[in-house]
Amino acid sequence: MYKRVLLKLSGEVLSGEGEKGFNHENIIYLVDELKKILEYGTNVGIVIGAGNLFRGREMQELSPTIADQIGMLGTVINALYLKDIFEKNNLRTVVVSQVSSLPSIRPIHYDDINLYFDAGYLVIFAGGTSNPFFTTDTAAALRAVEMKADILIKGTKVDGIYDKDPKKFTDARKFDTLTYDEAIDKGLKIMDTEAFSICKRYDMKILVMDFFKESNLLSAVREENVGTLVVPK
C-alpha cells in the first residue's frame, strides 16, 4: 500500500475529452475516486494540467513565454475550482503555488506540506514549475520528488504503456512493467524528457494507468496489477 502519492491529471479530466471548461459529473467522479484512497490514510498531492481552459499550441500568435504563463494561471484556476468542490464534498484541501498570492492559495514551503498531510489535507500544487517552457508533467515529477512520494501516478485515458498506439494497431502490446532504460531504448513516450529525467535521477516510480476505470486509482494505491509500472531497475 502506497502511503504517499503524487497524482498527475490532465485538464481533460475536468472537462471531458475534447471539451473545454468543467464537467460536474467528471469532477464528482474524481471526488469519489479520491475518497476511496483517502479512507486508507494515503497522502495525496495533485498536479493538474490546464488543457480544459487553454492550450498554448492553439495560440500561435502568442509568444511561448506568454502562452506558458497563461497556462500556469490556468492550473491555478483549476486548482481553486477543485478546492471548492472538494471541500463541499468533505475533502479538506489546500492549494499551494509559487505563482499566485491570492488569499486562498498558500506558498510552497515543504515543512508545511508535511504538516498538511499529517492533518489529513489533500494538497494541490498549482502553477506548474512557476517557469515557462516546462510542462505540467515536469511539475509533477518535481513535486513528487520534493514531497517524497512513494510513486507518481499518471492518470490517462489508456490502461498503460504500449509498444505502439493501441488505437491504431490491433496487435499493440501492453507492458506490465518497464525499467527506465528499457523505456528509453524502446523510444516510449511516457512523459516529456525533463520529467522523465527527474524521475530517473531520483528513482521515482511512475505508474501510467486508466484513470477513468472505476476504482482503478484505489487498485493502484494498493499496489495491485494496474496499468504499467516504470521502475528504476
Swiss-Prot record:
Q: Name one GO cellular component term.
A: cytoplasm
- Stored Gene3D superfamilies: Acetylglutamate kinase-like (3.40.1160.10)
Q: Does the keyword Phosphoprotein apply?
A: no
What compartments host this protein?
A: Cytoplasm
Q: Residues that bind ATP, according to the entry? A: K8, L9, S10, G11, G51, R55, T156, Y162, D165
- Any Pfam family hit: AA_kinase
> GO MF annotations for this entry?
ATP binding; UMP kinase activity
Documented EC number(s): 2.7.4.22
* InterPro entries from the UniProt entry: AceGlu_kinase-like_sf, Asp/Glu/Uridylate_kinase, Uridylate_kinase, Uridylate_kinase_bac
Control of this protein's activity is summarized as: Inhibited by UTP.
The UniProt keyword set, sorted, is: ATP-binding, Cytoplasm, Kinase, Nucleotide-binding, Pyrimidine biosynthesis, Transferase
Q: In which pathway does it act?
A: Pyrimidine metabolism; CTP biosynthesis via de novo pathway; UDP from UMP (UMPK route): step 1/1
The record ties this protein, via SUPFAM superfamilies, to: Carbamate kinase-like
Concerning its family, UniProt says: Belongs to the UMP kinase family.
Function statement: Catalyzes the reversible phosphorylation of UMP to UDP.
Oligomeric form and interacting partners: Homohexamer.
Q: What is this protein called?
A: Uridylate kinase
Q: Which organism is it from?
A: Thermosipho melanesiensis (strain DSM 12029 / CIP 104789 / BI429)
Q: Which gene encodes it?
A: pyrH
